[in-house]
From Swiss-Prot:
Keyword flag Cell membrane: no
Subcellular location: Endoplasmic reticulum membrane
Membrane-spanning segments: 43-63, 110-130
Family stated for the protein in its record: Belongs to the PHO88 family.
Underlying gene: pho88
Membrane topology: Multi-pass membrane protein
Signal peptide segment: none
Name recorded for this polypeptide: SRP-independent targeting protein 3 homolog
InterPro entries attached to this UniProt entry: SND3_fun (IPR012098)
Highest taxon above the source species: Eukaryota
Cellular component, GO annotation: endoplasmic reticulum membrane
Keyword Membrane part of the UniProt annotation: yes
Chief localization: endoplasmic reticulum
Amino acid sequence: MVSRWEKLKNNPQTKSIGISIFLMMITRVIDFSRPSLLWPLRILYATVNIVQIGIFLYTKIIIEKKNDLTVLKYVEPATPMSGREHSKFVATTVRDYDLSKLLTSFKQMLVTIATTLFMHLYMGYAPPLLLQSVSAARGLFDNSEVQIHVQNKPAIDELRRPFKSSGGLLGSFGQVLTDKKSVDEAELTKLKPT
């Protein structure tokens, strides 16, 4: 039986929070106004993002090359942010599911890059460059698609499709249902497949 401490210690969100707190303490000590420190930090940030984009594109190529057309059926619960009142039946292929999740992660990465660049270039803050360089590298290897297709981890437990929501702020509103009863019921009632 896994203890709560082990679960907490192995949780990627907990690790990210711990690393962020540690880096925030470091940023209070470092003088980011020195050009001898600022330019290498900018180069590090640009390099991490270029590598991240490259790995996302490489993962996309691998997914398309595998072309896994296994049918994946699940019921997506309605959440306050989805704008739907009822659950939605989804029938797709593993390939399309993986590509859609990878695209979602890619869009999140672009929003993070835009926010960080705005804070650095317009507002003049340098610490986000360090924080995002480290968290981007960590987040990339915590990405389910990268773990399955680049690191060749088996798609079991946490990596089983459809992926469980991360739990975050709205994760408690419902998980994706994959049990046969829920899927059959949704298919029969035709909850508008996508």
